[in-house]
């Protein structure tokens, strides 16, 4: 039988986000005249995870135009879009820890209630502190631009020049503060890593 440490903690329940609502906003405008038209749109999405750590925010902007000159002899079209995604990840191993962890362990440090308790023992840790004392996320950006120039030589004859470019960037970030069990076990004041990846076409 396990030791009774005098507390009553529902570890699994604390890991669940009870208000994991999402929201989405969208705005679009367009206009122009006979020789010029334009359109632009922007959107924002936010969704919290079912747990207390994960979330996702997304911002997007699109713009485009079409212009005609020289009485329709020359047409120019352009489009530009970019999307930024901010994500916070979760270590799902904390749920396994929550199921098997002694519920009489304290959630907060008994000597310093502003900190999460540090638990010792084989494969034993505070699953709430494991998430709260660590930042594990990623930032992505997708960009796409294309332009087309069309020359209408004759009513049934034209020539076009098209240019396009797309890029992706990803920044993976991890920050473990000094109160995290990883830092305490390894006698470190914390840990931070930042990795970046980029591709273009």
Which residue ranges define each predicted feature?
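Outer-envelope beta-barrel architecture signal
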Residues: 25, 34-38, 72-78, 155-161
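Surface-exposed loop/interface segments of Gram-negative outer-membrane beta-barrel transport/assembly proteins
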Residues: 1-8, 50-54, 60-144, 160-162, ...
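Residues embedded in well-ordered regular secondary structure
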Residues: 1-52, 90-93, 130-133, 150-152
């Amino acid at each position: 039988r396990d030791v009774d440490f005098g507390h009553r903690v529902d570890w699994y329940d604390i890991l669940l986000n009870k208000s994991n609502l999402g929201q989405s906003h969208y705005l679009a405008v367009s206009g122009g005249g006979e020789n010029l038209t334009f359109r632009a749109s922007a959107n924002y999405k936010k969704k919290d995870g079912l747990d207390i750590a994960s979330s996702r925010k997304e911002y997007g902007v699109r713009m485009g135009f079409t212009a005609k000159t020289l009485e329709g002899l020359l047409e120019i079209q352009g489009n530009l879009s970019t999307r930024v995604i901010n994500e916070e990840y979760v270590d799902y191993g904390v749920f396994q820890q929550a199921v098997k962890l002694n519920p009489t362990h304290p959630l907060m440090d008994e000597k310093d209630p502003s900190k999460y308790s540090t638990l010792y023992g084989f494969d034993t840790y505070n699953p709430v502190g494991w998430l709260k004392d660590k930042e594990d996320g990623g930032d992505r950006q997708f960009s796409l631009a294309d332009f087309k120039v069309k020359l209408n030589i004759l009513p049934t004859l034209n020539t076009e020049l098209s240019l396009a470019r797309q890029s992706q960037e990803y920044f993976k970030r991890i920050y473990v503060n000094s109160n995290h069990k990883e830092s305490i076990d390894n006698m470190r004041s914390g840990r931070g890593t930042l990795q970046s990846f980029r591709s273009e076409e």
